[in-house]
């Protein structure tokens, strides 16, 4: 899925076509969508699709005419009917006329921007947008770590008494 946004007077608008200063958000894009964006912006297809590989490591690379930023962001996952915490790659491609984000799944971090919850968010101020995304990611990491630590303390208190196999597995 490819969605195009642009802020005008601090309001995030959905666009039907690509314009200067826009944000192109790609969530689990098809190969055709990847090809179209790669061709339109003269980006190597591998640079866009690298964010879809869960094993891809974080990096920043300066390419000819664009910058690729790949970071792991936190995302919730349900396994065995329990909420778990994991990370997935988020690709951010910076071009002079647009910013492109690529992710395998729809994440709370990107949705925070789509819902226009960030103060002074502008798709035209690309570096600020990147900093805001990284800050939001760090904020979610911290919130998740607090929840994990709280759960760890609860389990440790239970383990002090009778220890069962499920307590050890949870820990």
Task: Show which residues each predicted segment covers.
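Peripheral, non-transmembrane regulatory/ligand-interaction domains of membrane transport proteins
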Residues: 1-171
């Amino acid at each position: 899925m490819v969605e195009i946004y642009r802020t005008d007077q601090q309001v995030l608008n959905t666009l039907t076509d690509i314009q200067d200063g826009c944000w192109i958000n790609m969530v689990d894009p098809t190969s055709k969508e990847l090809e179209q964006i790669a061709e339109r912006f003269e980006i190597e297809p591998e640079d866009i699709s690298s964010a879809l590989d869960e094993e891809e490591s974080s990096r920043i690379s300066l390419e000819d005419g664009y910058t690729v930023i790949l970071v792991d962001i936190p995302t919730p996952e349900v396994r065995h009917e329990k909420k778990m915490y994991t990370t997935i790659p988020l690709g951010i491609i910076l071009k002079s006329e647009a910013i492109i984000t690529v992710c395998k799944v729809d994440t709370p971090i990107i949705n925070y921007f789509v819902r226009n919850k960030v103060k002074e968010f502008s798709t035209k101020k690309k570096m600020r947008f990147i900093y805001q995304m990284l800050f939001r990611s760090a904020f979610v990491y911290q919130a998740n770590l607090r929840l994990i630590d709280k759960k760890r303390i609860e389990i440790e208190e239970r383990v002090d008494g009778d220890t069962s196999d499920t307590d050890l597995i949870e820990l």
